[in-house]
Amino acid sequence: MIKQYTFAVVGALGNVGTEMRGILETSDLPIENLVLLDIAQNAGTKVKWRGEEYTVAESNSDAFSGVDIAIMSAGEGASLELSPEAVKRGCVVIDNSTAFRMSQEHPLVIPEVNADALENHQGIIANPNCSTIQMLVALKPIHDTYKIKRVIVSTYQAVSGSGQAAVEELQNQTHAFANGKQLQAEVYPHQIAFNVLPHIDVFLENGYSKEEMKMILETAKILDPKIKMTATTVRVPVATSHSESLNIETEKAFEVEDIKTLMEASPGIELEDDPENNVYPLAINAAGKNAVFVGRIRRDFSTDNALNMWCVSDNLRKGAALNTVQIAEELVKRNLVRVP
């Protein structure tokens, strides 16, 4: 008899939490019961899931009693407060915030890249940053085959990565611009409509933004600390899906066609690479889909053993919600739903 589990979604009414609910609804996970948790103001909200009505409860320590797996997207503060309490109550936590990503005690996992890191988990598993996830899904097969030496990444990140208020700000500014009205900027320090901002998260003393350092440090933890890497992260006026320009230098020589064949054969990746017929990954096409789309694969002629690649994925799905559910699937498959 297949063991059934009680799942909790924390931050169930947010952008990512909504995606989590939707992905769980169509998943093959053996879910016996679903607990929906959110801030106190949202407690009592009714939500339909698999044809039944569920009532959202307040996120607190006692809410995790009887829960086997909690997937959390409620922010760093809530994660730091609630995750240890959930583990004390026998619940495995998959956390989408920054709270535990760089802790050596907690695995930082992308199932297509380093699922084996789950084996020795201590009750809390961290979900990586959205921009890191799609990049490493694309880099993993190249690294396994040709050994990556260096990566230069520039991102073009959708406003939904900043939350629903940012999506609404883009919509409102676009409407105001079309009607000749003054644009109001509240979520971002500058107008985002018809603009690009080389500014995601706070700036650090080294001149990098926190988002840029997340990509660098998470790559070292997940894929290989020997890879040299630099990043520039940019917010663009797109609602959903992050795009990335990747420049990759490898130790071993390669043929471009072999890289394309490798991409086609790799889990979680869809190759869209026929530029002569205007076929390449687009943010608007990736929205609502699970794959990491790659294309524009071509040799970098400026140095030996280097290539360029364009990579696009839905930041709310593979960049957040889907990856957490895939981690849960790995835990169930490997019989790792347990706490110390």
Language-model features: locations:
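Charged docking surfaces used in two-component/phosphorelay signaling
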Residues: 70, 159-340
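N-terminal Rossmann-like NAD(P) cofactor-binding subdomain of oxidoreductases
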Residues: 1-192, 228, 292-293, 297-302, ...
